[in-house]
From Swiss-Prot:
The protein's name: tRNA (adenine(58)-N(1))-methyltransferase catalytic subunit TRM61
UniProt keyword Transport present: no
Keyword Ribonucleoprotein applies: no
Residues where S-adenosyl-L-methionine binds: S119, G120, S121, E137, R142, D167, V168, D202
Residue ranges of the region described as Disordered: 281-323, 385-406
PROSITE patterns: SAM_TRM61 (PS51620)
Bias-annotated ranges (Polar residues): 394-406
An individual GO BP term: tRNA methylation
Superkingdom, taxonomy of origin: Eukaryota
Protein encoded by which gene: TRM61
Length: 406
């Protein structure tokens, strides 16, 4: 079972979990009986975690005090794994990966090529969404680390991921028997049919890998490509290679994110402001009178003590929350929804270059005839063609105007 593609309700011994300690501090943990997970907020026994639902808050009393520390135990997801994984290379974060998968049209039927496995962040997101992932890594040590990680997470044997040690810029994407790969060849099988319709290139020189793609992309449907390039000079060379090898719909974008902070703000009416001014004036007048009485030093010591702190009833009027703690959304006040945007835009991670390609454009005769019949129902002026060579005749502008007027 893969912890990243399947879900369960309760935590069991041997599960891989992600422990949310604080914002930006997420740790991976393998649950083992008898062991203890130590943090600055306390020590948490694994036995106390087993059997609890995923997402539970686990609390312990801090030694030597009455304070409690707690953690949250979460089910692994690609988004949370991105926050906790060991960085072997620069990774693709969720704002970029989610947009890339949407632009590539990834689905459970997709067959994806990922060149540049790196730390495996994007590989986990692909594995959850697509039907088959072929990932390539040229650095042997990173390949071995990623392979061990994918096997531990159940993405190889029980999953849909194949990782290969290969320099795709020099040797291409074909996987053959004898290559260093996680793919298990059947008896008599000498190669793998990649047949990919989505390609993601996270390479220093993607323009060197583009010429090798025609041998492995799908022949019967559109293939979509994304190149992840930090420098604009890389983008320039990539565009030249895409145009040279027949790729179309070429576009380069960058993702820049700004966070909107939404909250409720107290509505301050004019009448409330006037009443507040009157209240301040009354308090000021009361203070002046009290100081005057103290200055005259009238009465006994006990009377002076009483005058220093006069017992006046606590006022219940507080239009702006002054003098008492008011929680956001308190029913005693009127609120409105407001939002504040970050003043600075977070800088981009890389340029994203998208393109698409169809190797062979073929149409089925029956499909075309059905489409023409459907179109005829909406436009009676078009005659349906029974064969591909029978196209609706073209008409001049004057003839079309005359037919429309009739």
């Amino acid at each position: 079972m893969s912890y990243f593609t399947e879900y369960k309700d309760l935590i069991a011994e041997g599960d891989l979990v992600l422990v949310w300690i604080s914002r930006g501090n997420v740790k991976q943990l393998r649950i083992k009986s008898g062991e203890v997970f130590n943090t600055r907020y306390g020590s948490f026994a694994h036995d106390d975690i087993v059997g609890r639902p995923y997402g539970s808050q686990i609390g312990v009393r801090t030694k030597g005090s009455n304070r409690f520390g707690f953690i949250h135990v979460l089910q692994p997801t690609p988004e949370l794994w991105t926050l906790s994984l060991p960085h072997r290379t620069q990774i693709v974060y969720t704002p970029d990966s989610s947009y890339i998968m949407q632009r590539l049209g990834c689905s459970p039927q997709s067959r994806v090529i990922e060149a540049g496995t790196g730390s495996g962040s994007f590989s986990h997101a692909f594995a959850r969404t697509v039907g088959q992932l072929f990932s390539y890594e040229f650095h042997h040590m990173r390949y071995e680390q990623a392979l061990a990680e994918f096997q531990e997470h159940g993405l190889i044997a029980d999953g849909n991921v194949t990782i290969t040690h290969r320099d795709v810029c020099q040797k291409g994407f074909l996987i053959k028997a004898g290559d260093t790969t996680s793919y298990e060849f059947l008896e008599g099988q000498d190669s793998v049919s990649v047949n990919a319709d989505c390609i993601f290139l996270d390479l220093p020189a993607p323009w060197e890998a583009i010429p090798h793609l025609d041998a492995v992309i799908a022949k019967d449907r559109t293939a979509r490509l994304c190149c992840f390039s930090p420098c604009i000079e890389q983008v320039d060379k990539t565009l030249e290679a895409l145009e040279l090898h027949g790729w179309e719909e070429i576009e380069t974008v960058e993702i820049q994110g700004r966070q909107y902070e939404s909250r409720r703000q107290m509505v301050r009416q004019l009448d409330d402001a006037l009443e507040r001014l009157r209240d301040v004036k009354r308090r000021k007048q009361h203070g002046t009178e009290r100081r005057k009485r103290l200055g005259e030093q009238l009465g006994s010591v006990e009377e002076l003590t009483d005058d220093v702190r006069p017992k006046t009833p606590k006022t219940s009027y507080n239009p702006f929350g002054k003098g008492s703690r008011v929680k956001e959304g308190d029913n005693g006040f009127e609120w409105k929804q407001v939002a504040k945007v970050e003043s600075e835009i977070k800088s981009h991670t890389s340029y994203l270059t998208f393109a698409s390609k169809i190797l062979f454009k073929s149409r089925d005769e029956n499909t075309v005839s059905q489409l023409l019949e459907q179109y005829k129902d909406f436009n009676p002026n078009v005659k349906a063609a029974s064969k591909l060579d029978k196209r609706p005749q073209e008409t001049s502008f004057e003839e079309s105007q005359a037919s429309n007027s009739v």
